[in-house]
């Protein structure tokens, strides 16, 4: 079954510091299995044709902006692999920062909308190259990619987010939403930094179980190709904000 919702009208629906004590933190070595420096497809890339019935891929884009075209590419890639999804269009919130900070509210809404599904959020400028089999019988509350870059260590990347549908993730989203609002005047602050902060806090205070996604599931098309030259991406992100954030 393919789930897509389309509509009309006004709203169409179709600095984290390095912390080696954080259990999410894992330095990447060239021979580390996390880096996947292999020319052969990983087991996670092999698809037996069976879909994951309780997984819903969700995402959003701003209507009448270049992101609408990006979303069409995402939806096409989801349809190719018969991946159940709900990708919607929203009105422009007033700028790139406001639009990205909406992610916390969106995830909370999707958890309520799809109560029988775990969620896999992806930014609308991403595409799926194969079926995300990693999430079959995936056991955790939340998973994101924690990535070491030259300019920032252990950065939480929110382009791909797995969330189990439970009260812990609802609580996480509410705290994330609240922190986004508190920091909205700080234009240098990113929503994914806020998410990383809340994940760390909820691991300590709320028993949240998190995982570090493989690089192939949050694969930034150029930056991560430099880090993992032989990786075979499952979900590839094309960073449309680099050219669009000043226009939207």
What is the predicted role of each segment?
Residues 105, 170-248:
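Catalytic core and acceptor-binding pocket of nucleotide-sugar-dependent glycosyltransferases
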Residues 92-93, 126-127, 149-150, 167-168, ...:
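Short, solvent-exposed loop/turn segments at secondary-structure junctions
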Residues 2-3, 12-117, 167, 236-244:
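N-terminal anchoring/stem segment of glycosyltransferases
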Residues 101-156, 160-166, 170:
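GT-A fold catalytic core of metal-dependent nucleotide-sugar glycosyltransferases
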Residues 67, 71, 100, 154, ...:
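A structural signal for well-ordered alpha-helical scaffolds and beta->alpha junctions
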Residues 49-52, 137, 152-156, 226-231:
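Extracellular/periplasmic catalytic domains that process cell-envelope and extracellular macromolecules
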Residues 86-88, 120-123, 144, 209-214:
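A structural signal for short, well-ordered beta-strand segments and their strand-loop junctions
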């Amino acid at each position: 079954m393919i789930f897509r919702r389309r509509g009309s009208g006004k709203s169409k629906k179709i600095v984290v510091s390095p912390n080696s004590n954080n259990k999410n933190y894992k330095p990447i070595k060239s021979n580390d299995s996390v880096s996947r420096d292999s020319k052969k497809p990983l087991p996670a890339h092999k698809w037996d044709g069976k879909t994951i019935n309780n997984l819903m891929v969700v995402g959003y884009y701003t209507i009448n902006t270049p992101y609408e075209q990006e979303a069409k590419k995402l939806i096409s890639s989801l349809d190719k692999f018969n991946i159940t999804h709900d990708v919607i269009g929203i009105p422009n919130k007033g700028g790139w920062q406001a639009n990205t900070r909406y992610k916390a509210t969106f995830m909370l809404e999707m958890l309520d909308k799809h109560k029988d599904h775990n969620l896999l959020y992806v930014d609308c400028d991403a595409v799926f190259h194969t079926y995300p089999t990693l999430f079959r019988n995936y056991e955790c509350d939340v998973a994101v990619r924690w990535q070491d870059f030259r300019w920032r260590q252990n950065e939480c990347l929110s382009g791909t987010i797995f969330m189990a549908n439970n009260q812990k993730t609802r609580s996480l989203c509410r705290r994330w939403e609240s922190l986004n609002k508190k920091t909205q005047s700080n234009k240098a602050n990113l929503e994914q930094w806020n998410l990383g902060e809340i994940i760390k806090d909820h691991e300590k205070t709320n028993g949240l179980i998190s995982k570090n996604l493989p690089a192939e599931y949050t694969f930034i098309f150029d930056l991560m190709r430099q880090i993992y030259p032989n990786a075979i991406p499952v979900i590839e992100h094309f960073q449309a904000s680099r050219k669009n954030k000043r226009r939207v």
